[in-house]
Amino acid sequence: MIRSFTGWRYIFAVAIFMHHYQIDGKSVLQAGGVIGVTFFFILSGFLLAYGYKKRLMTREISTSDFYKARAVKLYPLHILCFAAVFLLGIRNFVTADLPKAVLNLFLLQSWVPSPDYYMSYNAVSWFLSDELFFYLMFPFVLPVLLNGSGKKIAVGAGIFAISYSAAAALIPSDHYHAYFYINPLSRFADFVFGILVFRIFDQRRQATVGHTSRAEAGAILLVFATFILFDHIPKPYHYCSVIFWGPVAMLIYIFANTSLSTNYPPHTRKIHYVLHKSVGPHRKRACRYKPDRAASFRKDCPVAPYNCSEKPVFVFI
């Protein structure tokens, strides 16, 4: 784990939370969801490549061991949240809901292009559904992306980006969310791009040491400019993550060797994950602001589910 990302993970987790926080039915930070999720998918590819490059490619660990470790990362909190939401709504459960429950439980709901499925139960678990697909593909795409011809990969990435952007402009607007924001195949591009960012970082590792504060400030300003200009981006591209690859990649690349996380508690990188995944069960109720009853948010709220679900399981990894 590159510690310099802990702070940024926390910042983008808060951005996603603010995206779900509404005042008078309007999101406080509309860009927080799209850009925040893109950041986490790209960072996921980067960090997995960083942590598993040698171990997988030298067969220090097997593919099955990798899958076991990832399953432990995904499922404990997911099952806890799923059970909580399921039990709260069990009185309204009907037989017709069974397929949704099964797909959600096994993190397959994102493959069905219908909000009734991918937003069922703990709605934000669609993110985990995508991550599950990424993890399954990771051992196979890693050697190809790290050892393949740089020119061929660059040409392929360019062709994909152009095709992806064109598709975003042509697809009916009512399909944007399902096919570009949620679908695992579409978001897999973010994950792959994160691995490619790691490839560049790894090849220029010595050159990345000692980045100037000017470069860091430039990366931060570029990301904030993206947030500010988000509303001016044509709506077809709001869910087209290719638009945000540049700013996010620059941020990750430049801060790969900094120590932004040194002022954060050791468990913060775990807490951001719990915060993101636990927004769903209560977001409609707790994330709407009313003048007579302001919703409150305490930074220690996610600590309990982390200590009760993920932390005990990590002992066995």
Where does each model-flagged region fall?
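Transmembrane alpha-helical segments and their boundary/interface "anchor" motifs
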Residues: 34-37, 41, 54-89, 96-107, ...
